[in-house]
Amino acid sequence: MMRRGDVYLADLSPVQGSEQGGIRPVVIIQNDTGNKYSPTVIVAAITGRINKAKIPTHVEIEKSKYKLDKDSVILLEQIRTLDKNRLKEKLTYLSDKKMKEVNNAIDISLGLHTIRSHKA
């Protein structure tokens, strides 16, 4: 069974505009109850283009620690729901420490955690 924090290769095509596409790694961010019973799964895209602007919704992952082809970045602003049939093969899983970074970036992406106060 797939678990929250697992990294899979997934087929993200077709896409529109600035969405991440193609066959690429994704990290499962859906809870494990949903992973067990739902035909869909919530994931965040991973990119190997680490020269992208580092923003608070990005979490870096090292190739040597996570058995990836290159150092990569989880894009927690690129969250989407996929049919489980889009998942190809499990590559690795993230440590509890790394998942805490992912959780923080999700909080920021969804506005659950404010970076700075916004005064009206």
UniProtKB/Swiss-Prot annotation:
Transmembrane segments: none annotated. It is an enzyme of class 3 (hydrolase). The lineage of its organism: Bacteria, Bacillati, Bacillota, Bacilli, Bacillales. Forms a complex with MazE which is no longer active as an endoribonuclease. Gene3D superfamilies: 2.30.30.110. Keywords: Endonuclease, Hydrolase, Nuclease, RNA-binding, Toxin-antitoxin system. This is Endoribonuclease MazF. Its EC number is 3.1.-.-. InterPro entries: PemK-like, Plasmid_toxin/cell-grow_inhib. One of its GO terms (biological process) is mRNA catabolic process. Belongs to the PemK/MazF family. SUPFAM superfamilies: Cell growth inhibitor/plasmid maintenance toxic component. Pfam families: PemK_toxin. It comes from Staphylococcus saprophyticus subsp. saprophyticus (strain ATCC 15305 / DSM 20229 / NCIMB 8711 / NCTC 7292 / S-41). Toxic component of a type II toxin-antitoxin (TA) system. Ribosome-independent, sequence-specific endoribonuclease that cleaves mRNA, thus inhibiting protein synthesis and inducing bacterial stasis. It cuts between the first and nucleotides of 5'-UACAU-3' in single-stranded RNA. Neutralized by coexpression with cognate antitoxin MazE. One of its GO terms (molecular function) is RNA binding.
